[in-house]
A protein has these predicted regions:
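Short secondary-structure boundary segments
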Residues: 126, 200-203, 224
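Non-catalytic pre-domain segments flanking phosphatase-related domains
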Residues: 2-24
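Structural recognition of alpha->loop->beta junctions
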Residues: 140-148, 209-229
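N-terminal helical cap/lid subdomain that shapes the substrate entry/recognition surface
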Residues: 19-109, 117
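Short acidic capping loops at alpha-helix termini that bridge into adjacent secondary structure
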Residues: 53-57, 80, 143-147, 173-177
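Substrate-recognition/cap helix-loop segment adjacent to the acidic, metal-dependent catalytic center
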Residues: 46-48, 69-78, 108, 112-122, ...
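Conserved Lys-Pro-Asp/Glu-containing loop-to-beta segment of HAD-superfamily phosphomonoesterases
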Residues: 158-186
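Acidic, Mg2+-coordinating phosphoryl-transfer loop and its flanking beta/alpha structural elements
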Residues: 177-219
Length: 234
């Protein structure tokens, strides 16, 4: 009788501590798509304004959704019907095969491992569905997640999306972790009270190492192969 009671206590403790869901950013986390995004914005801005913006000008607006970034670059409101969103999607699709032909090596296997461990998988991207969803399909990842939420043109809403995921799945903050590459991902995860794995395996990740470390991520990995073993320990 005592042993059964002890086992119930152990199982209850295990269930309370076990990680239940993993949320992933897309660009720079599941695939090296940041150069693709930057080139899409630069090319379209040049078509519209005649001026090709510098890379830093483009990335300075990251955190906003596609319409938010594009609107800033071409001097238009994100809800302006004339904003060339369709053309942006066209350019993005044209460049995708050459600039981002596949997800990071091991990404598919890692996601399958997370799912096999019984954890839910979510996507939280600052992009909007019209560019995030095509990338997930192109990479063959569209069947490997359970829920997705995207960005807004006026502000970074990843903290709100994390809170939304917890509400949808009835989770506590300790039962969920976010995996993202940008300094803002760390800030947004902390704001939501969620642990953050700073994904530092993209080719350009070292450029933001100082900024990321200054924000004290819970974990920082430079090799995606280390991610699944970490998640299984949490």
């Amino acid at each position: 009788m005592a042993n059964k009671k002890l086992m119930r206590v152990v199982h209850a403790w295990y269930d309370a501590c076990m990680l239940k869901a993993v949320m992933f950013d897309v660009d720079g986390t599941l695939g090296d798509t940041l150069p693709l995004c930057i080139e899409t914005y630069r090319r379209l801005a040049e078509e519209v304004t005649g001026r090709r913006p510098e890379v830093a000008e483009v990335t300075g607006h990251f955190g906003l959704s596609d319409r938010g970034v594009l609107g800033k670059l071409v001097g238009m409101e994100p809800d302006d019907p004339a904003l060339p969103v369709r053309r942006m999607v066209e350019i993005y699709g044209e460049l995708h095969p050459a600039m981002a032909p596949a997800p990071f090596p091991g990404a598919v296997e890692m996601l399958r491992g997370v799912r096999a461990a019984g954890m839910r998988i979510g996507i939280i991207s600052g992009k909007e569905a019209h560019t995030a969803a095509p990338t997930l399909r192109f990479f063959g990842l569209d069947s490997l997640y359970d829920w997705a939420a995207f960005g807004l043109p006026d502000r970074n809403v990843k903290a709100e999306r994390l809170l939304e995921a917890m509400q949808v799945w009835k989770l506590q903050p300790h039962e969920l972790v976010y995996v993202g590459d940008a300094p803002s991902d760390i800030t947004m995860a902390h704001r939501a009270g969620v642990r953050i794995v700073n994904a530092a395996w993209a080719p350009g990740a070292a450029q933001e190492a100082e900024a990321c470390l200054a924000l004290h991520p819970d974990y920082r990995l430079t090799d995606m192969a280390e991610l699944l073993p970490l998640l299984l320990r949490l």
